[in-house]
């Protein structure tokens, strides 16, 4: 029967189930493994797994009445294949597991041990870690000691550890997460996929922050060059997903506007940058990327955002059922969905060819968990190179590659609030890693010289005195943990930037944010941050522990999103893969609105659901 099914014309669930049973012979050999795997993977798109199990139980019971021993054993072979191919489904779905146990109990009662032995539900391992966003898997040790200083990390080392972090997060995504995203058009009640998207966005933002943390144009150019080579190594690892995140950060408007910085980037680096950008551009429906991915052998990490876009497009274009009664499923759509999801599922079966250093993983995890808004990054960019600054006169005529319509950020929703226990765990492990690697004399404290090295990994760190709470000239483990926990609590896990202070006067007394004493007098007795409005005494400036959080007006995401196309005007939810949007520029202070944004930014695409 498997050979007579014409999926393009549609079929019922029962017909497809019968076809999968008949795909087995009595010995358990599968004649049509593609059909069987497709149906077992895709059936939750149409019916719950518990209903499928009930249908299998009914078929087995009916075959007993008909004395069809062949049908009985084939049904058991299908159940065995299902458990073997998708074990997580049985561990995470208690109702499904109970139904299969009911079938096995029925076989045992009949004394049919041959058939019963085919169904081994009790040996399914636990997969609850796939549903726990806070779970951390053990990692292998590097044979040599690795420097944790960003400037000392080789591009391949950083590429390998970024690959490991994203791969570990990706392995937790299940079929049900993709199905939920496509049907709802968002990540509501989908924490695993939401966390992966946040990690992708964090990599892009971290790239921008590491560049903007450098005070001079030549220093920023060196960081850009470093990340271009990291992107090159990501391509060698065939990790296109993190490659997209890094290129998105390098191509962001907060970086692309730094003309003086780009004048210090070598022509060779610019050429390499352009090639990597062209690889992940949206031109031709990501044609360059798709061709490169198809030619890959071994481990490869596809750009999840591109394939989610494909799933959403299919969901909008084709119906699940071919009749109003919802009895004949759309086999053509099922095959197309399966081809996309099978490519994603293949990633988890091939481990990346990397080893990870636990200390560096802890450091990266905490670094990437910090969050800055686009406005904050853009504001820091303006502080580095104000718009009024004349163009640099440099013999180097290099310009950055044009900003591509890449997936800079996958969702316009706010970053999900992290579990506090996870934040504490990450911070404590990171601090322990810092002391193990940067406490050179082993006295259990960080000196000012050692602190300056650490600051290379955390450019948003406050002054040394803010961490040295007892002012003894060194920082203890407890003081460093306390600083990060305090910053995470006050700022909601979002580290800020240094203040842009100027002398100010006031007709009314204001309190110093550090010492809480009043700032008296109208003749510039205090300082005020131009970005966030924080006031403090001049003598308290370097001791202020509050990070700069630039004030911004509330922005309606619905108002800033482009209008849906006419053919989908009946839908109201919008899912955006890109930032910034034209509507958000109006929320910046007046000096930012004067900035001319590159016209290519309008080329980013939105998916409207």
UniProtKB/Swiss-Prot annotation:
Tree of life domain: Eukaryota
Localization: Cytoplasm, Cytosol; Cell membrane; Synapse, Synaptosome; Cell projection, Ruffle membrane
Tissues/organs with expression: Detected in platelets, neutrophils and T lymphocytes (at protein level). Expressed in brain where it is enriched in the striatum. Also expressed in the hematopoietic system. Detected in heart, brain, lung, placenta, liver, skeletal muscle and kidney.
Phosphoserine modification, residue list: 116-117, 147, 554, 576
Binding site for Ca(2+) 1: 439, 441, 443, 445, 450
Post-translational modification: Isoform 2 is palmitoylated and myristoylated.
Region of interest (Disordered), ranges: 382-406, 557-592
Membrane spanning residue stretches: none
Domain comment, as recorded: The N-terminal Ras-GEF domain mediates association with F-actin.
Quaternary state and interactors: Forms a signaling complex with RAP1 and BRAF. Interacts with RAP1. Interacts with F-actin.
Function: Functions as a calcium- and DAG-regulated nucleotide exchange factor specifically activating Rap through the exchange of bound GDP for GTP. May also activate other GTPases such as RRAS, RRAS2, NRAS, KRAS but not HRAS. Functions in aggregation of platelets and adhesion of T-lymphocytes and neutrophils probably through inside-out integrin activation. May function in the muscarinic acetylcholine receptor M1/CHRM1 signaling pathway.
Protein name: RAS guanyl-releasing protein 2
Organism of origin: Homo sapiens (Human)
Protein encoded by which gene: RASGRP2
